[in-house]
Regions:
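N-terminal, Lys/Arg-enriched amphipathic/low-complexity engagement segments
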Residues: 210-226, 449-452
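Glycine-rich cofactor/substrate-binding loops
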Residues: 2-43, 104-105, 288-468
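Glycine-rich cofactor-pocket loops
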Residues: 150-172, 273-284, 288-289, 320-328, ...
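Short amphipathic alpha-helical segments with heptad-repeat character
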Residues: 124, 128-135, 139, 146, ...
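Generic, well-ordered alpha-helical scaffold segments in large soluble proteins
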Residues: 47, 68-75, 97, 101, ...
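Acidic, glycine-rich loop-and-beta core segments that form the ion-binding/anion-interacting portion
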Residues: 222-314
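Conserved hydrophobic residue
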Residues: 56-57, 81, 271, 386, ...
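A helix-coil-helix interface module used to build multimeric assemblies
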Residues: 2-208, 213-219, 278-283, 293, ...
Length: 468
């Protein structure tokens, strides 16, 4: 019985006793790395073609291996491939199944290859595909944000600092801030792809191989830019996972910030937007409740993305070159992070599509807390040639006066305003209203409706022209 299980192991020849149960359990990764079946088959086909082309195995053997791998691919797609947990991982499961299908010739597939470079190749193919998918979904969200910004370019709302009403802005301007953030996120993934897209295949365990393999051929066949130049680096590095997870963590922080704002905006304290019932849940005890769970879940799940990055960094920080089994920990963390970021992107897109801003509530809130005080100070500088620090002090005194009288800045009389500076004239009322405040903004990138409309139009055009 002890030898029966060992015979199932591709590496079992050197061992005389069975593995302990705990060793089998800890060593198995099939529960989570089975999702790499397609990458593993594609990479193995490229390797088999190269072995045949270089006459390391015969062309007949090469074709037989490739044919068997294609049959396995079909079985996975149909959901009829039986995974054996005793075979540890997806790589050994596929190879063992290939042996059942085509016999001993399957044993030649691993010529000039180790699981070390095999796993690294599969993971690079996986990360490349996932980064491309993330980029697509980011673009999808940017398009929705730009459309909404274009539609609501002149809806006045309060802008905040320290969670206190600060200055009037437009709803469209606020949404476009996230378009800009997401563009930087997208660029980080594009940049990471340059370093992900290098082939470790052929590095073998760590020292390369004595077989006359053609790494350029397999690299090209798999769509990589080039084969990696150092075999030790090829099998031991995981920065090709860490870098996109760092980008994903920054993206997650942006999605979480947006989610937090959605949660605030639908609350009774703000009541800025409305979400449909389809994106909310109720309470098991309070019949009146309509909760923004979708945004709360995004906010919560994105912590796992950041956590995955931290965990992999901790795994890597103490590993000597080249390969150690610690590296198996990268997969489960990575898969969870990628799943969560992709789901979060879908959720945020649904929120943006279906949210409806409440114009009157937004405008009313924008008039509160003396939000045009900065405009008043700027008017004193521009029209009365008062130094800004002095204008700041005068405006502060005016605000204190309004607080005492419980009135808005726009409700002040010219007589009251002149009591603070005799040179103040009726023109000052043009900047005391929130709508006038945003319309007066002139600087590039500002919140004026005209500027927001131009920016939204620019983004809509740019995103339409991007490659899908």
């Amino acid at each position: 019985m002890a030898r029966k299980i060992q015979k199932n192991k591709m590496w079992g020849g050197r061992f005389n006793t069975d593995q302990d149960k705990i060793m089998l359990e800890m060593n198995s990764s099939i529960e989570f790395d089975s999702r790499l079946y397609l990458e593993d088959i594609i990479a193995s086909i490229a390797h088999a073609k190269m072995l045949g082309k270089k006459k390391i195995i015969s062309s007949v053997e090469s074709q037989k291996i490739i044919s068997g791998l294609k049959k396995i691919k079909i079985e996975f797609e149909k959901g009829i491939f039986n995974l054996d947990p005793l075979l540890e991982d997806i790589h050994m499961n596929i190879e063992a199944n290939l042996q059942k299908k085509i016999g001993n010739v399957a044993k030649k597939l691993h010529t000039g290859r180790s699981r070390n470079d095999q796993v690294a190749t599969d993971m690079r193919l996986y990360m490349r595909k996932q980064c491309q998918e993330i980029i697509k979904k980011i673009t999808m969200i940017q398009k929705e944000l730009s459309k909404k910004a274009n539609k609501y370019y002149d809806f006045i709302m309060p802008g905040f600092t320290h969670m206190q009403i600060a200055q009037p802005v437009t709803f469209g301007h606020h949404l476009l801030a996230y378009v800009e953030m997401l563009e930087r996120d997208k660029n980080r993934f594009h940049d990471a792809l340059k370093r992900i897209n290098q082939s470790p295949l052929g590095a073998a365990a760590l020292a390369g191989t004595t077989f006359p393999i053609d790494r350029e051929m397999t690299s090209k066949a798999l769509g990589f830019t080039n084969p990696m130049a150092n075999s030790i680096d090829a099998v031991s590095s995981r920065d090709f996972i860490i870098e996109p997870l760092a980008a994903a963590s920054i993206l997650a922080s942006h999605l979480s910030r947006f989610s937090e704002e959605i949660i605030l905006w639908v609350s009774e304290g703000f009541d800025f937007i409305e979400l449909p019932d389809s994106l909310a849940t109720g309470s098991s005890i309070m019949p009146q409740k309509k909760n923004p769970d979708i945004a709360e879940l995004v906010r919560g799940k994105n912590g796992r993305v950041i956590g995955a990055l931290m965990s992999i960094l901790v795994v890597m920080k103490g590993l000597p070159l080249a390969y150690s089994k610690d590296l198996q920990e990268d997969k489960e963390l990575t898969f969870d992070a990628i799943d969560n970021i992709l789901n979060s992107l879908e959720a945020i897109n649904a929120i943006i599509k279906k949210l409806k801003p409440k114009k009157e509530n937004l405008s009313s809130a924008a008039q509160k807390s003396y939000s045009t005080a900065t405009d008043l100070a700027d008017w004193l500088v521009s029209n009365l040639n008062i130094p800004f620090r002095e204008a700041h002090k005068i405006t502060g005194n005016i605000v204190r006066y309004c607080e005492k009288k419980k009135i808005k800045l726009s409700e002040l009389t010219i007589k009251e305003l002149k009591s603070f500076n005799k040179k103040i004239n009726d023109d000052i009322f043009n900047v005391l209203d929130a709508e006038q405040s945003v319309n007066q903004k002139k600087s590039f990138g500002s919140t004026s409706p005209l500027m927001v409309k131009k920016s939204a139009t620019k983004w809509i055009k740019k995103l339409q022209n991007e490659k899908k």
